[in-house]
Amino acid sequence: MAGKPETRYDSKKITDSIKGLKDFYTGMLALALFEAIRGVADAPHERFFPQFWLLLFAFCTTLLPFYHGNVRYFDDNYLDKTPSSARLFMLDFLLLSVVGALLVWMGAIFGEKFKPDYFIKLYACLLVMDIVV
């Protein structure tokens, strides 16, 4: 058996990594929701207008599908114990981190200096990124 040794992946390490990544992503989305709530609480109420509430609703209803979809993606693609799936883990981790950071950024926009056009551009960027990735 002189040849290239077969690469083996430790399924416990992969499972632990996925669990840690899901916890990290959960924290990022919780921070995004917290930032949106904090912005609403800190902003003067006379600045609120129907478009603000509509965009806040769109943001909050976007968090759950993004969370559920990404967590399920990692379960389906990395916990099925196929060796080839572990090769792209770092790329998926990077992209998930970018999506999480974008959601936190969007949550932080709500508040006194809320700009609907800016929020809509970030929201469109998030949706395009979700479609492409």
Language-model region placement:
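N-terminal topogenic module of multi-pass integral membrane proteins
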Residues: 1-69
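Membrane-proximal helix-loop-helix units in multi-pass membrane proteins
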Residues: 91-133
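Physicochemical signature of membrane-embedded alpha-helices that form the seven-helix bundle of GPCRs
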Residues: 18-21, 53-57, 87, 91, ...
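Juxtamembrane helix-capping/reentrant segments at transmembrane boundaries
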Residues: 79-95
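Membrane-helix interface/capping segments
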Residues: 67-84
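Membrane-interfacial segments
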Residues: 41-45, 74-77, 110-111
